[in-house]
Amino acid sequence: MAKEKKVEQITDMEVDFAQWFTDVCIKAELVDYSDVKGLFIMRPYGYAIWENIQKILDGKFKATGHQNVAMPMLIPESLLQKEKDHVEGFAPECAWVTMGGSEELPERLCVRPTSETLFCQHWSHIVHSWRDLPCLYNQWCSVMRWEKTTRPFLRGREFLWQEGHTLHATEAEARKETLQMLEIYAETCEQELAMPVIRGNKTDKEKFAGAVNTYTIECMMHDHKALQSGTSHYFGDGFARAFDITYTDKNNQQAYPHQTSWGMSTRVIGGLIMTHGDNSGLVLPPHIAPIQVIVLPIAAHKPGVTEKAEELVARLKAAGLRAQGDFSDNSPGWKFANWEMKGVPLRVEIGPKDIEAGHCVAVRRDNGEKITVALDELEARIPELLETVQQGLFDKAKRNLDEHTYAAHSLAEAKELQEKNGGFIKTMWCGDLACELEMKDKAGMSSRCIPFQQEHLDDVCPVCGKPAKCMIYWGVAY
């Protein structure tokens, strides 16, 4: 009964998926609300997930030659306006500072929604020669975008992210960088977060403000909606021209450098929740779980049980695992439900009979399977089980993606498939904006990406009947 009471605090996802998501965020102690709409407090458990993702990404960035920097939070309005497409894309979401103390500022300052303009202004001061290139920078920070509709992790007015910004001598180098960073995001999602992705190009309508090309990784959530989980942008030399960034090349000629930017945010935590979670709460992949193993003493009042549980925690920590024991006076049922809600990948139970038999019982969070583990094999078996859980979560998510991706050969069929099944609908496309808008208007789907891995489904666009140029994914997105 105690377990049921704990779990019933979470709305079933089949009843109301949006409320289920909010319940999990709050009940699992990931976030709390602040007094300002859209500004969320990230609690220690939620922040620990972000720290683990951050550590993985930061290592990959540094391994590819990138350096961390810190740019100011405030951008002068005149600076933001230097690149026309960029400012038009972000103007509706900007938050402005107009007062400094009791004095009105001579120029409005934008709280950064992204930092391209700040990096460009800096580079205009320091880049003069081909020897100054490439500039490979990244920063970890928060940004502000004044969203109208807000939700924890998915749509916050302030959110944490990393934004990489690089400057290169040639288009080829910049394009290589753009794709390299997209692949880092894809590998992180698939290998660390157990979230399968579709890699591809954004359409001109959906690309980043000021970009020549935007590349994306798209993930499918448990409710079969899409989540854009990371993007990488090639800007050409547009920003360089706007900010007068020039360098002397190896032929002693003046040239404009080529620019990229790429970002991943705490939105991926929302993706984690919606990809792996269930009606008991979070289900976390072991690679990024703040606690990988929770050890629970059963019949803790019996002699030697608590001591043995403490010993197991110490051994697991010594083996390099993130392990913790629950020695509170709550009932076993309450503890089971609590740690299930928090998504801990493995629960290890140890009681008097287990000690006598020389084993413990490991319980997988993802499927509830119970595995007997000999105590003298603990350090070998538990890491193996964690890897099994990690792979199992990826495989389950990949099945969800594959089973809910459909091919359509007409607009009517695309609409019918989406309304009946949700998921991704793949069709051919002529490349015209008018057909993209009609798909949105008639079938309620936006373009997700033009995948790198192309298939030939038809010769013509299903919307207009003109010759098709590519295959494209459509879907309803967060």
PLM regions and their residue ranges:
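NTP/phosphate- and nucleic-acid-binding module
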Residues: 1-478
